[in-house]
Curated annotation (Swiss-Prot):
Group of enzyme by EC: translocase
One BP term from GO: peptide transport
Protein source organism: Rattus norvegicus
Membrane spanning stretches: 9-29, 39-60, 68-88, 111-131, 164-184, 205-225, 276-296, 306-326, 396-416, 421-441
Main subcellular location: endoplasmic reticulum
GO cellular component: endoplasmic reticulum membrane; membrane; MHC class I peptide loading complex; TAP complex
Domain ABC transporter: 480-719
Protein name, entry field: Antigen peptide transporter 1
Upper classification of the organism: Eukaryota, Metazoa, Chordata, Craniata, Vertebrata
Amino acid sequence: MAAHAWPTAALLLLLVDWLLLRPVLPGIFSLLVPEVPLLRVWAVGLSRWAILGLGVRGVLGVTAGARGWLAALQPLVAALGLALPGLASFRKLSAWGALREGDNAGLLHWNSRLDAFVLSYVAALPAAALWHKLGGFWAPSGHKGAGDMLCRMLGFLDSKKGRLHLVLVLLILSCLGEMAIPFFTGRITDWILQDKTAPSFARNMWLMCILTIASTVLEFAGDGIYNITMGHMHSRVHGEVFRAVLHQETGFFLKNPTGSITSRVTEDTSNVCESISDKLNLFLWYLGRGLCLLAFMIWGSFYLTVVTLLSLPLLFLLPRRLGKVYQSLAVKVQESLAKSTQVALEALSAMPTVRSFANEEGEAQKFRQKLEEMKPLNKKEALAYVTEVWTMSVSGMLLKVGILYLGGQLVVRGAVSSGNLVSFVLYQLQFTRAVEVLLSIYPSMQKSVGASEKIFEYLDRTPCSPLSGSLAPLNMKGLVKFQDVSFAYPNHPNVQVLQGLTFTLYPGKVTALVGPNGSGKSTVAALLQNLYQPTGGKVLLDGEPLVQYDHHYLHTQVAAVGQEPLLFGRSFRENIAYGLTRTPTMEEITAVAMESGAHDFISGFPQGYDTEVGETGNQLSGGQRQAVALARALIRKPRLLILDDATSALDAGNQLRVQRLLYESPEWASRTVLLITQQLSLAERAHHILFLKEGSVCEQGTHLQLMERGGCYRSMVEALAAPSD
């Protein structure tokens, strides 16, 4: 059925409903249940709901263009089906007295009239629209609402479902125990007013005390189990989010500032887990309490309970609207907070630079500026919260006054006893409080949704370049080929860094890559490590594209050391063995440290290789960090070693030691080495030199060949050798 055909379907449903009410359903159920008119009313109503519900599902299934508001037909048919049975039951059970059974049967006859039929739709449409609107907490398919987020967060507790079930049982038992005080207070009131002595008074008082104490003990046990379980969820969510971030492609970290990522992994995740562990605890507790109170209220006075429930929509509407405002403000606050965190992170991570430029006050002012930008958002957030709390307080007060007035009228008529009214008022006060707490929790839970959406963005995000390769050959030669490679960084897609780059790196050879700054030398190193994918051409290793290799295998065969390597805030031993799937022996660690020139200064520390290097290795000099990073690469015994100005901070003795290792060690005679450098002494000794200019190879050959050619390489050598003014 096309989208424009929905009016025909709606008219058909109206015709079916009219026929059901006129001759069909009343006639059938008058034969099946002739002696019980109230049961007949319920049978007609439920059958009407079921038949129309199937029709609505059919309309929604074949109508494509108007599904948004047509979804409200489902609560509409429910309202139509339940309205008449609900009215009949209310009139029968209310304090105004039971109807005659004939009156119940007369309701069916009245509802089959045309004017009543139209009136039922007029009355049901607003109720259905409200139902459909409030039902947005559980968002339709394709949209993640707060309920979906909550269910997904609880999905992290799949292995702890038994504990959650136990918590729910303890919660229900504890809530039932809390009903003892209002219940026995009502009974005592009746005894006093009737001037009777109750032989079982003491026994009832003891029973009330026992139930109250048991309720407290059960609540304590439930809270303890709940908090332990939520702590498990907290740890798991943090771990899963951080793991998801680590598996993103390298370009992801260029597009997203480190401060923003850190804020999501730490602060946003903590906000969500805090909401689940604290707010959900309160929500479940007051929900269970409210349901128990509602049951006792119905037992005390069905009429007063209906009056109380009819006032609840007024309490729900405004908080629902404020919750949406609160959620949007929460997202904006989190984004603004991430920006201020990024400013602080940049300043703290570059303190030597900040101090060398005497810009401490400038950074502080910039941070204050970011915080000032958050103030309007915080004010709006606070105003929405205060308005919501004030509205609930006034509504609750009006409800209490109304219940006292109506309850007094029922006592005067003899419909309820004074004790029952006292118990009901106590139940109703606690029930209203439970509703108020639930509504006050709702905006804060909406606030956590703003943060959880960001978290699930990371958990659901598929890397643009997934590490899905599977090649892991037993023997690798280390032959590297760049075939017409082009590349632009993801954060600057219109700036071509490499253009038509073609060259070969041979096993057993040291190839030097030289060229001016910005020519793409470090980009070549990044592509060889499979940190990025070329936008054009291929990067082959032993004839296979790098992306085809298993991620862990590739990085045991390819190792790189940069000019400013980062170390982790761990021991020398852990930094050198970083990333290895096996645990190296101390002899292996010492051997590579000696080859890189790191052993001597490491041995000078009191704790030797167990000494912590500080955050990012900031307790070491640049040369010491390079030596440790070089040892970290050498211990892998890679088939391809990439040195990107990796020895520039080493002293002359250690530089010579590294050169002897690369050129004279039998172990390195068959390995491939790419030496990215601006030092002529290192380039001269290389077996082959590639001169890179504007993202492509300008010329290549040995040092002597390039000097004789008199091209770009020779010009650079002469410029570096020329005395400065």
